[in-house]
Structure formats: C-alpha cells, structure tokens
C-alpha cells in the first residue's frame, strides 16, 4: 500500500509538471508546432484522434479560403446582372457555405465524442481542446472573449437581411424602370408599344359621365382629353395580349441576364453552380392557365368591342359628311361641323374641304399613323333632307341618340326618294320663271305666260335630259342659254305680240344663274377658306361667261335666219310696282318646292323672302347706283330674321334663309341689265359681220356680266356675316352655326 501511494504521488507530480510545461509554452508555433501537442497526449488512440482533428482543421481552413475565392469570382461575374438577383445569390451562397461548415463540425464533434466516450479523461480533454480553439477554426490556447463572438458575422442576421432585400425587390411597383427588374424576355413583356395617354380601351362609365358634364358646361366643344386609338393600334394591342405570343427577336438587341451570366461564368465539370436551400415557400413561376385564358378572352372581347365601336364612329362621320355635301350644307362651315362631331365622338381626325370632295384623315395615337378617306359626291340642294340630317347631327352632338341609331337613320334618309318627282320639278321651273319675270325684269302678263313655257323647256333639259346623260350635263348651261335666247327672240319677233325679248330671256334663265355658286365662294373667302373659295369664284366667272356666250350665240342664230328679228330689250308695257309684291311670295314658294322643302317649312321661308325683297326694293329706290350696297342691306335683314328663327324657335336658319337669298340675286342682276348686252353683240355680229370692234364689245359684255354677279354676291355675303355677328356674337355652345 505504501509503494502504491508513492507511485501515485510521483505520477501526479509528473502530470502536473507536464501540464505546467505545456501551459508555459508560447502559442507562436501555430499549426506547424502541433506535433508537440501529440507528446502531451498519451496513447496511440488519442494520437490518431488528435491527428484527425488537425487534418480536419486544415481541410476546413482550405475550404474556407476556396469558398472565399469562389465568392469573389461570383461577385465579379454578378456585376453585369441586376443588383437584386446578384445580391440574393451571393448571400444564399455564403449562407450555404456557413451551414455546410457548421454541419460538418457537428458531425465531427459527435464522432469524436462517441469515440472518446470509453476513454474517460480523453473525451474531456478533446472537448476542452475544441472549446479553446474556437470550434476548430483558429488554434489558440485561451478561449475567445464573448465580445469577439458577438462582433463576428451572424449568418442568421445576414439571411434576414437578404430576405428583406428580396422581399423589397419582389414588391417593387410595376411603374418603375424595367432595368431594375429581371431582364429576361417573355412572351408577354417582350413586345413593347409606345404608351398612349389617350388610348381608351378601358371602359369607365363614371369617367365618361364626368367628361360629358365638363363638355356640357363649356361654351364650345374643346379638344377631347382622351381620344380613341385607331384600328391598327387596337390590333397590335390584341396581338400583345395573346398568351402564347412570342416577342419578336432582332439581332443586336440587348441580351438577357441569363445569357450574360452564362457567357462570363466558367463552365465545365469542375464548376458547379451553388445549390440554394429554400428558406421560405415561393409561388410557382408558371401562371395559372385558367386565369390566363380568362384574362386573354376578356381582353380580346374588350378590344374587339373597341374596334367595332371605332369603325362605327368612323363610318358615321363619313356618312354625315356625305349627307351634308349632298343636301347643301353651308360649305364655309362644313369643316367646323365635322370637327365638332369628331371631338364629341373622341375621334382624332382632320378635315380639308375642296369643292366637290372632302379629305378626311383619322389619326391613330398608338402607332402614330393616319387613315385617309376621300368623300366625293355631287353637291345639290334638298332642304327637307338637310333639315333631317341637321337634326340627327344635333342629337349626336348633344348625346341624345347613339352613333349606331344615327348611322341607320342617315342611311334611311339617303335611301328615301325626293318629296317631289322630276316631272313636277319641270312644271315648278316654268312657274318660277313666270313669277320672277314681272317683279325682277319688268315683264307684263303676256311675258309671264311665255316665260312659263320657256322655263319648262329649261327644266326639261335639267331634270330629264341632263340626269340621264352625263355627257350632256357638261354642256347644259350653254345649250340651255342658246335655246332660251333663240326661242325668246323668235317669239319676240312676232308682230303685234307685245312679247318682250329681254324680260323673257332673263326670266327663263333666272334659275340657272350662278348666284348661289358665287355666294358660296365669297363666304368661303371671307371665312379664310382660300382654296375652296378661289376655285368656286373662278368657276362662277367662267360659268357666267358660258351663259353670256350662249345668249349671244342663240340671238345671233335667229338673226341669221330671220333678218327682221327684234332688237328691243326694254318692255313697252310694265305692270304696276305694287303688283310686284304679289309675285314675290309665288317665286319664293316655287323655289322652296324645287329645292325639296316640306310644306311645314314653307311659311317661314316665304315670310323671310318677302321681308328681304321689301327692304331691297325701297333701298334701291334711294341708292340707285349701288347694287352691292342694296344687296347687303337686304341680306342683312334676311340673316337677322333667319338667325332669330333659329335662336328663339329652334329652327334651321340656313333652310329658312336660302329662298330669300335666291330672290336677291335676280333683282341685283336686273338692276344693271347685263344679260341684255349680249343681244347688242348679237345684232352687231349679224349686221357687221366679223369686225374687231364687235369682238371687243362681246368681251366687255361677258366680263361685265361676271363682275356684276360678283358685286351682288359680295354684298350679300357681307350682310349675312353682319347679321350672324349681331345674333350670335359668341357663337353657339356645342354645335356649329348652321347658317349662311
């Protein structure tokens, strides 16, 4: 027992001495002096375990440096991609590395603890060694302070920061720049169109009601805040919304992030992309096919309805324009009417009027293109149909009826026949000629009957022959003036017939005088429509020369046939001036019926026409040498009455004023008797043959007739504009001024 106690004491002293010598050793030996540590641990098995720990530490240190180099390379490659994607990938990679290291050391600790469980003190020594070396990462003797552990990087905190960044990137608004999001192309987002601020593919009833209220409060129809896109833009929008549509690929475009990363990063068997562990559940990137199909169907239906509505509005604008031109709307305000209509319908369009045609351009704000349409038709006068079309125009502008109903109504109006057939118009032509002869050209009762017969011949040529022969319609004015002049001189040459040649010729040609043409031209010039006004004025002058040439040729033909033809241009017998006021209502009635006016419109027309003639007659008695001034006074009165009828009684001013304007033109022409100057030229042609003086006289008379027509119509246009300014000083609220 004594020896055993002595040996135990010596072993305890030796063990304490070895521990003191090991603790006094300097730690500068680091990894290279680790074999000295083996000497302190006795036993072969303990040496193997310690050698395994050293090898594990070296391997993990090398893995750490390799992982850090790999992270640096990945960071350099990820600079060419998006910030959010690169940051999330690097954080996930680092987290994976840390987790793998922790798992490895957990397994190693469990393995060593299981191996040393049978050795007693050896297991405690290994636990102390692992704790002193900081988990095997840095081999030091003393334990690391708690402050250094807290100062080190925390994988959990880094993972939470990365998660917050990913969530922030995931919830970015779609209105931000596309470059900050994923740049990979897809079938839906790969095809981009220019954003149109006025594209109205989303139907919003509340927004439309607010727009209508704003427009009703305005004093005129302003340009719409939102215009409808064109057909081409809608079709492109439909193509874009297709679920299976592929974006068009073009060489030279910017490559996606996946392509850039695959080109810059190394490839091969030695390189493996890091595998990330899903820390939170993520939704599938594949969209729900049922929702996609439903969304595509709704979008297609909405765009289809939009295209159909857009085409319907375009068709209505074209039909309305054609109806206005066919039925005699004021040409100097025609562009204004169409602009008002297009603004109300939210259509981006422009209009250019030329005599006989209208150029219409429909714009498309989506594709920056335009569709040009040309509306051509033969212009005429139909007062009743014009009244109906204007009523539809007002209802559409004030949003009373829909565009579809308005289009169908216009089609019905255009398909209807005229109120009065052609044979009745022929008789009305004779009636008007007989009515205008006494009060405008000084004819008596016998001349009234003769003018009726010759006027029926003119009506036959215009309504029957010219309508059936396009070739004859080009020479109608010349042939009609030749026939009228020849027949009137033949009848006037009958002895003791008391037929006045001058009054008969002028009365029979009163309805084909170019007064309305010159009036429209002067109104267009005064409205700054230079192209249309200049063309119409020049045509009216040439038209007047045609009439003068026809009168001269017809009178000369009868003079060559009958040498004793009459040369008298002034009637011997005239009716009392008071009888003239009786024939004016008849002439206005005949003009209204020829121009297809309804009987309900006639009383207002006749009243306005009679008032204008009374003013013209008495002003002519005072201003004998000023034809244009007299015409302007009469037109001013007619315009005041017509515009008041439109403003107070809500009638159509243009249709009410037109017969009164027609009454003013023959009166102005008769005041200077320019048509009769052609008879003097015809007499000189028959008596003197081909003389130079005769040609000069004929040229002066033809030009003087055209100049007289222009003077009268300019006076009428000035009076009409002055009357409009008095009644409508600020225009109308939403519709254009439908007046002369």
From Swiss-Prot:
Its main location: membrane. The keyword Transmembrane helix applies. GO terms for molecular function: transmembrane transporter activity. PANTHER family: PHEROMONE-REGULATED MEMBRANE PROTEIN 10. Residues 256-267 have a biased composition (Polar residues). Residues 1-48, 65-97, 241-269 are annotated as: Disordered. It comes from Eremothecium gossypii (strain ATCC 10895 / CBS 109.51 / FGSC 9923 / NRRL Y-1056) (Yeast). It is a multi-pass membrane protein. Pfam families: ThrE, ThrE_2. GO terms for cellular component: membrane. This is Pheromone-regulated membrane protein 10. Residues 19-33 have a biased composition (Low complexity). Residues 67-76 have a biased composition (Acidic residues). Residues 7-18 have a biased composition (Basic and acidic residues). Keywords: Membrane, Transmembrane, Transmembrane helix. The chain crosses the membrane at residues 422-442, 445-465, 475-495, 499-519, 541-561, 574-594, 599-619, 622-642, 651-671, 707-727. It is found in: Membrane. It comes from the Eukaryota. Signal peptide: none annotated. Belongs to the ThrE exporter (TC 2.A.79) family.
